[in-house]
Amino acid sequence: MPALPLIVFDVNETLLDLETMEPTFQRIFGDTSAMRLWFANLIMYSAALTVAGCYVPFTEIGAAVKKMLADTRGIKIDDRDKKELTEKFSTMPPHPEVPGALRKLRGAGFRLFTLTDNLLDVQTR
C-alpha cells in the first residue's frame, strides 16, 4: 500500500497570524516594525542555540530578545507589558484561510503535521 502524502507546517507566522501582535509592539516600542525585528531575532537565536545543541525554551528566548530590543532603544518594558506580549504570542489566532485550507487538505487525503519550538502548554492553547 502506498504511503499517504504528508505536509509538514511551521506554526508561528505560517499558520498563526503574527501581525496580531503589531498593536502591542506599536504601543510599547512606538514602531510596528519592532515586531518583525523581534521575531527575526527570535528565530535566529532559536536556530543558533539548536545548532549549538543548547536547549532554551522558546518563551525564554523571546523574553531575552524583547529585553535586548528594548535596551537598544532605551525602553523599559514593565511587567504588565511583558505579560501582554507573552499572552499575545501564546494566543495568536490562525490566519483566516488556515482552518478551511487544512480541512480541504485533510479531506484530500493528506496527513498534516506541524513543527514548532513552542512549549507544550503554548501548543495546546
Segments and roles (model prediction):
Residues R80-P93, V98-R125:
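Substrate-recognition element of Asp-dependent hydrolases with the DxDx(T/V) motif
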Residues M1-I43:
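Active-site neighborhood of HAD-like aspartate-dependent phosphohydrolases
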